[in-house]
């Protein structure tokens, strides 16, 4: 046919059988990729330390999505939560991967069948014998089925009625597990951090979809609306489908980057705003102050802080710290976290407690500045020692540790104090192993960053695709020079002007 690469889909424009075939093949590729990727991630995933070396630090992409829907155990005997797997059954990580690969194979066979048997009676109008699709009816069928699926997911899977529920955690991502969730029908269901709203909205949206599907199956569209929206044109279906997909992509990019109700921080890592706002730092300080108020010493108070919570309060776990073109998981950057060193409290020679100013998300290097309770700069690491006024040597800065490996230790040597001050810029101080994976010390983003970037970019591309195909279907008569509802068959070369019966070509004698 000699079609250029960007026009090859023309071959399925008026061929419903092969249009089904290529969609089946596409779904086969998606399911096959998902299953294969899951097996690859399972092969490289180290489940030994879910606290300091969780799946999101290791760059796992599909495993967190399985875990949030209730798949948390492996046939290998381990669990996402760190315990031993107890009777994972078929729906383990490996079972889900295998199911996707088997599904991929079946879809491939279905695609081949529909490619070979493309000219089915189903696609022909019994009155005329011409190829015809009842697109409004098909729309109703698809809407009904998707509504049924949406309702079933909310009413059965998420509620635990027939399914595991979903991943639920506390606001600080410390005690997460898979639990059944009751729907929240009140105003709190609109709280973006309330998982009960997710359940209620799936049930409600499913019911609306079922009703809408039945409506479109029983009520025919008015003729004017049918023509205005080009409901008889398959490219209208393409355009509106692309619109649905790009809208969904924009939504999930937003929920991934900003929220954590459906993307728990235990599975996908913290959001950048939790670092920006000192979210975990404030909670840690609140817990410490509460313990001290109850009579605990600073050492005891800091020792009660979960290592998991302290690890969230570390800049290297912010998804905004990694450049988009730095490939690899987080552990290939700063390394594999080994242990929490403890919370460093800095003081100057006059006994004032100093706070190290924390590194903002978009800085790779940042001056080491220590301020007192009033925000006055009392110490820094100068760029030029000749002009320094607040150097650690001049200010007599020391650091004492509470909790962690260095609990109870105090360092007075300026070289040691500077080392810990630089580390304190990044939040809580941890010891990292950079040798095992040959980590280069340059921060990487978490799967949260990759997912957001990918979906935002593709949403934008699909938005333009929607405009393109929408314009093609609405202005089809303008582009082709043929009216959309022209009844008489146009014979090319019969008329001097296409479709104008008064301008017949004169045949040469």
Swiss-Prot record:
The keyword Thylakoid applies. Gene3D superfamilies: Photosystem II CP47 reaction center protein (3.10.680.10). Disulfide bonds: none annotated. Its main location: membrane. Keywords: Chlorophyll, Chromophore, Membrane, Photosynthesis, Photosystem II, Thylakoid, Transmembrane, Transmembrane helix. GO terms for molecular function: chlorophyll binding; electron transporter, transferring electrons within the cyclic electron transport pathway of photosynthesis activity. It is a multi-pass membrane protein. It is found in: Cellular thylakoid membrane. Binds multiple chlorophylls. PSII binds additional chlorophylls, carotenoids and specific lipids. It comes from the Bacteria. PSII is composed of 1 copy each of membrane proteins PsbA, PsbB, PsbC, PsbD, PsbE, PsbF, PsbH, PsbI, PsbJ, PsbK, PsbL, PsbM, PsbT, PsbX, PsbY, PsbZ, Psb30/Ycf12, peripheral proteins PsbO, CyanoQ (PsbQ), PsbU, PsbV and a large number of cofactors. It forms dimeric complexes. This is Photosystem II CP47 reaction center protein. The gene is psbB.
